[in-house]
């Protein structure tokens, strides 16, 4: 299963917004975040993105005292952004139409393996972690533009450790109520 249509749609935002400006004089602000994670996310194992899915899988492994099994080698690299950072940057983008097409990313690639161990630590999971290399890794890298760092060099992104810990704490507390 692939997300090529989702990725393509994100790329088309910029093209469409430019076309509206040229043809109709309309200004649109398109912000395209990398992998968003945080409280209130969709933690459903069938339909969630990587961070909430891994948090949910780790929680199940913890509660059931089973290994935390992760698809693939853990080597692919991704960029993650905490939802409150996306909110702050989106509000900023509305006030700065000169930066109408911006990829929201801390500009730091993290391996899936690093993410898995960050989640396991935040969850206090000390069981076995298995990377099932019979399952696909997906694309190795999905690099993004670092234009945001040039435009807002002083913006302080939430460190992955802090964002993951806050998300894990919320998920555990709200397990009975959250979307899963």
What feature does the model see in each segment?
Residues 33-36, 73:
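Active-site loop/turn elements of alpha/beta-hydrolase fold enzymes
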Residues 46, 50, 111:
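Short acidic-hydrophobic sequence patches enriched in Asp/Glu that either
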Residues 9, 47, 141:
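Short, conserved glycine- and acidic-residue-centered signature motifs
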């Amino acid at each position: 299963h692939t997300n090529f249509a989702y990725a393509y749609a994100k790329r088309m935002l910029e093209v469409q917004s430019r076309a509206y400006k040229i043809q109709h004089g309309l200004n649109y602000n398109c912000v395209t975040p990398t992998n968003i994670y945080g409280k209130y996310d969709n933690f459903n194992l069938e339909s969630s993105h990587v961070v909430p899915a891994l948090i949910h899988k780790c929680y199940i492994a913890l509660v059931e005292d089973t290994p935390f099994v992760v698809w693939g080698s853990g080597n692919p690299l991704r960029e993650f952004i905490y939802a409150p950072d996306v909110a702050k940057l989106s509000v900023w983008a509305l006030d700065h139409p000169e930066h109408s097409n911006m990829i929201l990313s801390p500009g730091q690639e993290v391996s899936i393996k690093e993410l898995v161990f960050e989640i396991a630590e935040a969850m206090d999971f000390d069981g076995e972690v298995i990377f099932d290399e019979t399952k696909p890794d997906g694309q190795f890298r999905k690099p993004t533009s670092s234009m945001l760092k040039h435009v807002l060099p002083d913006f302080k992104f939430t460190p992955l450790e802090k964002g993951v810990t806050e998300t894990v704490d919320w998920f555990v507390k709200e397990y009975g109520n959250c979307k899963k």
